Amino acid sequence: MKKMFRRVLTLLLSVFVLFCALAAAACGPGEEDKEKPTPSEGKTVSRIAYTDAGKAYLEVDGNPFTYAGAQIRIDGFMDEEHQSIDEMERYFKLAADMNVTMVELPIQWKDIEPEKDQYDFRNVGKLLGFAQKYGLKVELLLFTVNVCGMSGVAPNYINQDAKTYPRYPSDLTDSTVAFYEQDNPNLLERESLAVEHLMSAVADWCEVAGENVVIAVQVHNEPDVFPLWRLQQYNVMTLDGSRRLTDMEAWEETLAALDTIGKVVKNSEYKVVTRVNTAIAWDAAWEAFVPDIYELEGIDIVGDDTYNETVSVNKEVMQNLSSGDLAGNLPHVAENRGSYGSSASLILAVFCMGGGYDIYDLITPKVFIEDWGWVDEGIIYSYDEDDPSTSMKDKPHTDLARRVLYGVKNAGYEMTLAPVGDIAGFNLKGNYPETSCEQTVDTSSVRITFSTREGALAFAIVRGGYLTLFSTHAAQFTLSNGTFSGAELGAYGTDGTFTASGSVAMSDGSVSLEGMQVCRIKIDSTDGSLTSTAVENIG
C-alpha cells in the first residue's frame, strides 16, 4: 500500500509540475527571453536496448555505445579555482587521451538560471563544443536540489525564499546550503523548468552542430545520502520543527523528485537515457531501496559509486545491479576513484561483467585537495600551476588503465553485445595483474589459453562467428575446441564494421600479439558447447 500510495502521489505531482512547466516562460541558449516555443515531439537520442539474450546496453543514435567515462569537475575548476571556460578545453583533451568515450559534466542550477526566468547556456554550449572537438560524448550531471544529500547550488531566488521553497530545519550553519523539501510543488516546478530549458538548449546546439553530443543525464547526485546519512549527521527536522524527519519520509520525497525530474528529461524535445548514482547500492542494509529507484518511470538505469579498489567487490556490484529486482538494469560503476592503483583491473573486470565504468575523477581540482582536504581522486595528477613539472602528468597506474580503455573502446561493439559468459578476462584473479601469468578460460564454445611475461591484461570475446582478442602488452592466445582462421588486426566502428589494418600469423590455433592490438579471428567450427568459466576467473 505504501508503494502504491507513493506512486499515485508521484503521478499526480508529476502531472502538476508538467502542466506548470508547459505554461511557464523559457529562453534559448545565451538569451533572456520569456517566450517559450511550442513543445515538439522531439527525438530520441539514446535508450536502453537489449540483445536477444536479454543483455542490457546503451544505444546511441541506433548503435551500441561503449559506456566508458570520466568525470570533469568543471564546477571546482571554475567556481573555486576561477579558471575560465576556455581553460576547460585542456581537460577534454586529457579525457580523449585516456581513451574514454564520454565525459560527465556537473551542471549547477545556479549557473544556468542565475536569475529567475533568466537562463544562460553559453558555457554549456562551449563545453559541448570541446567534447565534439575531441570525439567525446557527454553525460550531464544535474546538480540541483540533491547533491550528496543537500544543495548549495540552487539559484539565489530559491535559497532566499524559504516560504515559497521550504527547507528543513537542521544543524547546518552555512546559510548557502540547505535541505530542501525536494517534492515541494513550487520547488519542483522551478527545477523542472530549468531542466526543460536545458534540454531545449541542448537540442538546439546539437542540431546546429550536426551531432548528438549529449547522450545521458544523471538526475541529482548520490541522492540516497539524504536519508542514509544527512538526517542524523545534521539533525534534520520536519518543517514545523516538532521532530526529526524519518528516513522513510526522506526516501519517499527523494524518489518523487527523481521521478519527476527524470520525466522532464524523457518528455523533452531531446530524449536521452536517465540514470541515478547511489552511494550504497552494495550495502545490504540499503540495497532494497535501489529497485525502487529502478522502478521509477522517469529513471532508466541505476549505478553505484563503489569507491572500492578490489576486483571482487566491483564484480559483485555488477552482479547485484543486474539480477533479481534489478534484472534488465544496465549495471555500471557510476563513480570509482581514479587514484586507485588497481584501476586498470577494475575497469576491465567491470566491462567483462557486462557493465559500464565512470572514473571519478579525471583530474582533481587543486583546491579540493589543498583547501578542502579531499583525497586526490584523479587518474591523472592534479593541475598544479606552481609546479609545471607535475602539471597534468600520468600517475604510475595511468598508462595501464589507458591501455585497457583503448582495447575496450576499439572492441566496444563486440564487448557491448556479447553475453557475459562469452567475454573472457585474463590476469584478473587479483587486484593487480601478475607479471607472469598463464590461464585457461572457457567461453560457451571456445577454450582460450592465455600467457604473458609482461604483466598484460587481456580479453577475448566470442560473438557472431568471430573471436576478438586484445592485450595491453605482449601475450599469446591459444585457441581450442574448434577450428579458426584469418587473424586480422584492426578496430570496430560504432556500427560494428571491423576495419582491418593488417594481419597476424596463426599456427595451430596460437596467436601472439604485441600489445595494444585488437585482433579478429574467424571461428570456422566448434566441437560442441562448453560450460563458461569466464565469470569465475574474475576476482
Regions found by a protein language model. Give the residues of each.
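N-terminal carbohydrate-binding accessory modules
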Residues: E35-T101
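Active-site-adjacent "subsite" loops/lids of carbohydrate-active enzymes
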Residues: V124, V145-A203
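Aromatic- and acid-rich polysaccharide-binding/catalytic face
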Residues: I215, N221, Q232-M248, A285-V313
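Catalytic-core region of carbohydrate-active enzymes that cleave or remodel glycosidic bonds
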Residues: L136, G262-Y270, P291-G407
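Aromatic-lined carbohydrate-recognition surfaces of secreted/lumenal glycan-active proteins
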Residues: L141-F143, E207-E222, A250-A288, G303-D304, ...
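Aromatic- and carboxylate-lined catalytic core of secreted/periplasmic carbohydrate-active enzymes
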Residues: A344-F484, G496
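Aromatic-lined substrate-binding rim segments of carbohydrate-active enzymes
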Residues: I85-A162, W251-V273
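Sec-dependent signal peptide cleavage junction
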Residues: C20-S40
